[in-house]
A protein has these predicted regions:
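Glycine-enriched alpha-helix->loop->beta-strand junction motifs that scaffold or abut catalytic
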Residues: 52-58, 84-86, 141, 163-170, ...
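Divalent-metal coordination cores built from histidine and acidic residues
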Residues: 1-97
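His/Asp/Glu-enriched, well-ordered alpha-helical/loop segment
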Residues: 112-133, 137-142, 192, 213-214, ...
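Active-site glycine- and acidic-residue-rich loops that bind
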Residues: 37-41, 64-79, 146-161, 195-209
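Divalent metal-coordination and catalytic microenvironments
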Residues: 33, 58, 91, 145, ...
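Divalent metal-binding pocket/active-site signature
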Residues: 9, 62-154, 219, 224-228
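Hard-cation-handling environments
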Residues: 139, 150-183, 207-222, 226-227
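Histidine/acidic-residue-rich catalytic or RNA/ligand-binding cores of hydrolases
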Residues: 15, 96-112, 129-130, 155-163, ...
Length: 272
């Protein structure tokens, strides 16, 4: 099964474009499928038209990433969180923090910013600030929130494990790359491991692993993005973020099992 994000070409920002995905998938997909409705700063009416029984949720990029679907208008965010009956899935990075950090990096290195600056530009603080805002909005409006690809130790402290999964209104996921790589790997892997949110410190990685073990993070996902090796080999600002992980996720988790990180039972639980 797969659940596809809306930052495709074209972006799934209208009911017509969303339905087109379902129509095409019904003809060619060999797997179970579902699609997220996309949000932007100016398509609130389209988002609220979405039938929650037909989609896996609405996706909000609270920080700009691949596809340029940033939603940073507070009125729009309030409208989605207050008016939507769907699961709201958020990419949480604070855009202003990223822009400020990026400007400082460009002032020092120009267009030749080293990849090692990626977790400095898209910092842990940017993630925490945005995740905190998403949780504030969800709590205010009793919305069903799912925060995607948690990557920092500080964020893991936001989530609970003292209530049953079926009763949670706020859930979180981690992705394979944030469970595997650390910022020490940039020296050898370069832009090939450029993701948003960024791969961060070993302390962050280990905290995310522990949050999975303790059930504060509920799901392990792939964040699959089919970028080519040629695209990923560009300089920092030109190389797209993301990578193809559908085919690598389970082998990587089995390696983590053999390394004593996760039990097989935990892997089954978090990927099912």
């Amino acid at each position: 099964s797969y659940m596809e994000m809306p930052n495709t070409v074209p972006n799934a920002l209208t009911q017509e474009l969303l339905q087109d995905k379902y129509d095409r998938a019904s003809e060619v997909s060999l797997a179970n499928y579902s699609f997220f409705m996309g949000a932007s700063n100016d398509n609130l009416d389209e988002v609220l038209k979405t039938d929650p029984k037909k989609v896996c949720g609405v996706k909000i990029f609270m920080g700009a990433s691949t596809g340029n679907m940033l939603v940073d208008n507070r009125t729009t965010l309030e409208g989605i969180f207050s008016g939507s009956d769907m699961l709201i899935a958020t990419h949480c990075e604070d855009e202003q923090t990223i822009r400020d950090n990026s400007a400082r990096a460009k002032a020092q290195w120009g267009e030749d910013v080293p990849i090692e600056q990626h977790p400095v530009i898209r910092s842990a603080e940017a993630c925490y600030k945005s995740s905190s805002l998403a949780m504030e909005l969800a709590t205010k409006h009793n919305a069903r929130l799912h925060i995607l690809h948690i990557s920092t130790a500080k964020e893991t402290e936001l989530f609970r494990n003292d209530i049953p999964m079926e009763d949670k209104r706020i859930t979180a996921e981690a992705c394979i790359h944030h469970l595997w790589f650390t910022d020490a790997d940039y020296a050898k892997k370069g832009t090939h491991i450029k993701w948003n949110p960024a791969v961060k410190s070993i302390e962050d990685r280990n905290a995310v692993r522990q949050a999975i073990i303790e059930d504060r993070i509920d799901i392990i996902a792939t964040d699959h993005a089919p970028h080519t090796l040629e695209e990923k080999s560009n300089k920092y600002f030109s190389a797209p973020s993301g990578g193809p992980l559908v085919q690598h996720a389970l082998p990587a988790l089995f390696d983590m099992y053999h390394d004593g990180v996760f039990s097989l039972e935990k892997i089954v639980e978090k990927t099912s």
